[in-house]
Amino acid sequence: MHDAGLDYYGRRLATCSSDKTIKIFEIEGETHRLVETLKGHEGAVWCIAWAHPKFGTILASSSYDGKVLIWREQHQNTTSPVAVNTWTKVFDFSLHTASVNMVSWAPHESGCLLACASSDGHVSVLEFQDNSWTHQIFHAHGMGVNSISWAPAASPGSLISANPGPGQQRRFVTGGSDNLLKIWDYNSETKSYNLSQTLEGHSDWVRDVAWSPSILSKSYIASASQDKTVRIWTSDVSNPGQWASQQLEFDTVLWRVSWSPSGNILAVSGGDNKVSLWKENLKGQWEKVKDIEE
């Protein structure tokens, strides 16, 4: 199994694996039952992501086959007293020429937007609007894009600012096999995503990036690398173009970083099957608060 994710309500679990399928389970209390197996990919499925429920019951998947598939659960009108729901593939995006390693939905305030990171060096952004899908695709990292994460829709400090700006921002960070992180901003006039910042520091592939959902006074991005470090990049609202980083060192190659919903705790996992939790102390240093062994 390569990825697993609960839907917004925690009632559905989707998993994906090397057998080219996606499985949907219903969670009821302590039990779960398989309700659907989705087939459509021609290679290992690396990543799945649930859209926000305001857009419907929608799941995106990406695979080694270079495709991004969008699946939707729809209610079937039948004479049966039991509700019948069926999953259908509603969009097949196959413009990438190599593995699509990660898909990530934008914050729902920005619209129904899906960003996709591919080994072909390109990022695509799919948008569902007025009952149809449109896409943009652009070159991002020379040696391939491994990961992608959206910034929160509200900019840092907008909650505490006396005169907040337009608030809605469309930006995301990518991590590449060129050891770099890149931050991309949407320009509403040109309707394109432009590179606004390159963050250097890792000495090997950046495997995962995660933008913290916190929108207090700082922005935080965590990155996990094959160089056995996690870097936590911070930018203050008073100087948004300036990013400082702190390095956390490990004994193993690192695969994933993930923030808690409030954005104050970071989970790190790597090649040793351990998960560690980290928190910023009052001096601004990141400290390990817990080790979880499988």
UniProtKB/Swiss-Prot annotation:
The keyword Hydrolase does not apply. One of its GO terms (cellular component) is GATOR2 complex. WD repeats lie at residues 1-35, 40-81, 95-136, 140-194, 201-243, 249-288. Pfam families: WD40. It is found in: Cytoplasmic vesicle, COPII-coated vesicle membrane; Endoplasmic reticulum membrane; Nucleus, Nuclear pore complex. Gene3D superfamilies: YVTN repeat-like/Quinoprotein amine dehydrogenase. Keywords: Cytoplasmic vesicle, Endoplasmic reticulum, ER-Golgi transport, Membrane, mRNA transport, Nuclear pore complex, Nucleus, Protein transport, Repeat, Translocation, Transport, WD repeat. It is a peripheral membrane protein. Component of the coat protein complex II (COPII) which promotes the formation of transport vesicles from the endoplasmic reticulum (ER). The coat has two main functions, the physical deformation of the endoplasmic reticulum membrane into vesicles and the selection of cargo molecules. It also functions as a component of the nuclear pore complex (NPC). NPC components, collectively referred to as nucleoporins (NUPs), can play the role of both NPC structural components and of docking or interaction partners for transiently associated nuclear transport factors. The COPII coat is composed of at least 5 proteins: the sec23/24 complex, the sec13/31 complex, and the protein sar1. Component of the nuclear pore complex (NPC). NPC constitutes the exclusive means of nucleocytoplasmic transport. NPCs allow the passive diffusion of ions and small molecules and the active, nuclear transport receptor-mediated bidirectional transport of macromolecules such as proteins, RNAs, ribonucleoparticles (RNPs), and ribosomal subunits across the nuclear envelope. Due to its 8-fold rotational symmetry, all subunits are present with 8 copies or multiples thereof. This is Protein transport protein sec13. It comes from Aspergillus oryzae (strain ATCC 42149 / RIB 40) (Yellow koji mold).
